[in-house]
UniProtKB/Swiss-Prot annotation:
Keywords: Iron, Iron-sulfur, Metal-binding, Mitochondrion, Pyridoxal phosphate, Transferase, Transit peptide, tRNA processing. Pfam families: Aminotran_5 (PF00266). Belongs to the class-V pyridoxal-phosphate-dependent aminotransferase family. NifS/IscS subfamily. One of its GO terms (biological process) is intracellular iron ion homeostasis. Residues 30-47 have a biased composition (Polar residues). This is Cysteine desulfurase, mitochondrial. It is found in: Mitochondrion. It catalyses: (sulfur carrier)-H + L-cysteine = (sulfur carrier)-SH + L-alanine. Induction: Expression is up-regulated at high-iron conditions. Its EC number is 2.8.1.7.
């Protein structure tokens, strides 16, 4: 249960007063006149703690109560946030998650009282801050059954991935010059691998099945005597596929190859035991687990020891692997977010699975839709639902859904109009890849929001398809594959 009651609206778009949210949403506006609707705004009833959606924002109705134990009122800050305008429903948690109010409450004291440099060992200000940093390090390690000394703080998962994929091969470059990864990794992994190719390393990019999973036999065949590192992500950021980490770790350990996994989308969301799974390096991101942005971590195994060249050098902080003064507010927030992920795991799992099932079934009831991912529940993270809507471009649908915050792929590449390389790797053609939308469900998503999204998607897909000549031909029974387009 929430120990601190934090009622807030505005940018978070939620009122947290208990484990349950009561949400009232408007019906989607008819799309015959315009495919886009006014974005709904969330405001709260201070008496009931219920969350309501209305348009436009009425700041006079916003009621903010600071969390218990907080010495600062956040009322003004939230009112300022509401001035940014109406807030759409947020279903893009793979890109980032809202900061949990309890995490924010934990961070505030480091801006007002505990402001010492954790590396200052000559006075109490440094000692008390260092104590809190180590406490956070322990919380983060506990989630993956690691030793706190194996947690190295970084600026985020991108830096951590660079640190692992560049640092390990560089340290062992005299004897080992081969790296293995997959075609569906995050861009920062693929770009780091290509960078190592420029340095003279050979890289093998493993293919995946139509459901996004690697073939373990392909991995076994790809490993060579000079293979230094295997980097395979735990949960894909676009389609939510879970790779068989335990089996991969076993193969790597048997062949004396280091195993790195990008767990930015998996940490705290699926069970991970670095010892049982033989994981040597693991990337973590705070802002994917309802923590602050700008902080992450790299798990680096101590026994058997993993050696790597540091990317950032200087003062020798973080065991000499990542120099630079730590930011105690971010570290403390990260630690609290990790503690809550472990504490709330059973609730989050039930909540997300329930809403995911409802959303997936509702979307796939629309004609000519396709789920992108794995149909085996054991290999699919339910919080990520990627669906292709045939005969519609994903960008067009996103423009028609201004009242819902969604993505057509990775947030790091969403500005590009190129079709998803992840879906291409699954065998999807350009048209299908272009028509995909990623829906993300998280801790603060409500059932009422999912109901609203299903209805809105149904109406606007129908509206856009009525403007598509291809859809009209399909409705008339014409097989598009039989048409010789070059002759028209």
């Amino acid at each position: 249960m929430y120990k601190s009651i934090f009622k807030t609206t505005g940018r978070l778009g939620k009122t947290v007063s208990s484990r349950n949210f009561v949400t009232t949403l408007p019906k989607p506006l008819a799309t015959s006149s315009s495919p886009a609707t006014n974005a709904p705004n969330k405001t709260s009833n201070p008496k009931t703690g219920e969350l309501h959606v209305s348009t436009p924002v009425d700041t006079a109705k916003i009621s903010i109560e600071p969390p218990e134990g907080s010495s600062i009122s956040l009322k003004s800050a939230s009112r300022d946030a509401s001035l940014f305008g109406t807030r759409p429903i947020y279903l893009d948690v793979q890109a980032t998650t809202p900061v949990d109010p309890r995490v924010l409450d934990k961070m505030l004291e480091f801006y007002t009282g505990l402001y010492g440099n954790p590396h200052s060992s000559t006075h109490a200000y440094g000692w008390e801050t260092d104590k809190e940093v180590e406490k956070a390090r322990t919380y983060i390690a506990d989630v993956i059954n690691a030793d706190p000394k194996e947690i190295i703080f970084t600026s985020g998962a991108t830096e951590t991935n660079n640190m692992a994929i560049k640092g390990v091969p560089r340290f062992y470059k005299k004897t080992k010059k081969h790296i293995i990864t997959t075609q569906t990794e995050h861009k920062c992994v693929l770009d780091s691998a290509r960078h190592m190719q420029d340095e003279g390393f050979e890289v093998t990019y493993l293919p995946v099945s139509s459901e996004g999973l690697i073939n373990l036999d392909d991995l076994k065949k790809a490993i060579r005597k000079d293979t230094v590192l295997v980097s395979i992500m735990a949960v894909n950021n676009e389609i939510g596929v879970i790779q068989p980490l335990k089996e991969i770790g076993k193969i790597c350990r048997e062949n004396k190859v280091f195993f790195h996994t990008d767990a930015a989308q998996a940490y705290g969301k699926i069970p991970i035991d670095v010892n049982e799974m033989n994981i040597d390096l693991l990337s973590i991101s705070s802002h994917k687990i309802y923590g602050p942005k700008g902080i992450g971590a790299c798990y680096v195994r101590r026994r058997p020891r993993v050696r790597l060249d540091p990317i950032i050098t200087g003062g020798g902080q973080e065991r000499g692997l990542r120099s630079g003064t730590l930011a105690p507010p971010l570290v403390a927030g990260f630690g609290e977010a990790a503690r809550l992920m472990k504490q709330e795991s059973s609730f989050d799992k039930r909540h997300i699975e329930k809403l995911s099932s409802k959303l997936k079934n509702g979307l796939l009831s629309i004609p000519s839709t396709q789920f992108n991912g794995c149909n085996d529940a054991k290999s699919q993270y339910p919080g990520c639902v990627n669906v292709s809507f045939a005969y519609i471009e994903g960008e067009s649908l996103l423009m028609a859904l201004k009242d819902i915050a969604l993505s057509s792929g990775s947030a790091c590449t969403s500005a590009s109009l190129e079709p998803s390389y992840v879906l291409h790797a699954l065998g999807a053609d350009d048209a299908l890849a272009h028509s995909s939308i990623r829906f993300g469900i998280g801790r603060f998503t409500t059932e009422a929001e999912v109901d609203y999204v299903i209805q809105a998607i149904n109406e606007r897909v129908d509206f856009l398809r009525k403007m598509s000549p291809l859809w009209e031909m399909v409705q008339e029974g014409i097989d598009l594959n039989t048409i010789e387009w070059s002759g028209h």
